Every structure is written in C-alpha cells, then in structure tokens.
C-alpha cells in the first residue's frame, strides 16, 4: 500500500478497493461486465473524526491498513495519480475484517 497525499476531512475515510473476483470457485472466468462492485477494501487514510455539539472530537473506528467491508453504493469514487480510490463516510463502513 503506497502513501497517498490525500487527507480525508472529519469522519471521512480513503479506501482502495480490493480487486473483484475474476473466476468462480469452479474455475469459470467472470467477464468484466458481470463482475460485482467490490465491497471490501484497504483503508489508505483516515480523517481526524467529527466534532460533536460539545466541541469534542469523536475519532473514527478504523485505522490505516485495516481491511473493511463497506456499503455497496456508499462513498465517492475518485482517481488520483493513476489509482482508483473511494472516499467513504465512517457510517458507510459496515465491518473491519480480522486477519
């Protein structure tokens, strides 16, 4: 995972999506047009967290390097330095994958 010069704001998270499966369990090749949009990725950068009404910063529950599962249609896709990323709100992250 390369370092990126993008710093998400507040409770936003920068994620690099993991590659979608290219073959089925039985060995059939899945064409690009039939591939599911990936819902798993690696956290590349994390914002400092949002500020509540009392002025306290609430930190984000994930950290750089975490593998996360996120909402299928959440986030904004961006392209930076030839790489594709997703900027997600912390609310779009559904789970952290344990290794």
From Swiss-Prot:
One of its GO terms (biological process) is chaperone cofactor-dependent protein refolding. PROSITE patterns: CHAPERONINS_CPN10. Pfam families: Cpn10. The keyword Transferase does not apply. SMART domains: Cpn10 (SM00883). GO terms for cellular component: cytoplasm. Keywords: Chaperone, Cytoplasm. The keyword Chaperone applies. It is found in: Cytoplasm. Its main location: cytoplasm. GO terms for molecular function: ATP binding; metal ion binding; protein folding chaperone; protein-folding chaperone binding; unfolded protein binding. Heptamer of 7 subunits arranged in a ring. Interacts with the chaperonin GroEL. Together with the chaperonin GroEL, plays an essential role in assisting protein folding. The GroEL-GroES system forms a nano-cage that allows encapsulation of the non-native substrate proteins and provides a physical environment optimized to promote and accelerate protein folding. GroES binds to the apical surface of the GroEL ring, thereby capping the opening of the GroEL channel. PANTHER family: 10 KDA HEAT SHOCK PROTEIN, CO-CHAPERONIN GROES. NCBIfam families: PRK00364.1-6, PRK00364.2-2, PRK00364.2-4, PRK00364.2-5. Belongs to the GroES chaperonin family. HAMAP family: CH10 (MF_00580). This is Co-chaperonin GroES.
């Amino acid at each position: 995972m390369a370092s990126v010069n993008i710093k998400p704001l507040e409770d936003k998270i920068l994620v690099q999506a993991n590659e979608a499966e290219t073959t089925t369990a039985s060995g059939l090749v899945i064409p690009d047009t039939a591939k599911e949009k990936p819902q798993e990725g690696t956290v590349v950068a994390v914002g400092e967290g949002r500020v509540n009404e009392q002025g306290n910063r609430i930190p984000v529950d994930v950290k750089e390097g975490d593998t996360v599962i996120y909402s299928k249609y959440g986030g904004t896709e961006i392209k930076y330095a030839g790489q594709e990323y997703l900027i997600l709100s912390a609310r779009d992250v559904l789970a952290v994958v344990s290794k």
